[in-house]
Amino acid sequence: CIGLFNDEYEPRAFGDNFQKLGTSTILIEAGGFKADPEKQEIRKFYFAAMLRGINSIATKSYLQKNTSHYFDIPKNNKQIFHILIHGLVVDGIKASIGINYDEYPTHDGMGTEKIYSIQDIGDLSFCDAYQTFSSENFSLNGEIIFNQNANFELSDKHKMILCFQNGQLL
């Protein structure tokens, strides 16, 4: 699925600051694939895109390309979460929750750990996720707090589905 992102200047964006200083840049940005948390598949696409780009620059074939088709790409309007849970009752209201993780280096520096946090609560029927859970029978033990580390257990008819403790998925 391809979506066109907003191209306004973002002061926190690495490449935008190089462009601001007058350096030409090529932006290659992508999400990931389901069941590919290490992003090995997407790296293949990055590599192929860089090869095609270098070839296009070397042969000047980019001069013959019609760039108007670029703006035919639909605008990205979907929120994609790592985990999306539908069918919860939160504070007496039926809702969905969207959960994302950030990766941090482990203490030994040899790997990373994922810390999950609640990124959205409400009607998320328009959203997608790498993992989606949906049931009318979910029970929740713990609290759902927006923008805080996930810290709850999710069960479906006494079967444990997910368990988070201080942001870590157990």
Regions from the PLM with identified roles:
Residues 1-170:
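C-terminal accessory segments enriched in acidic
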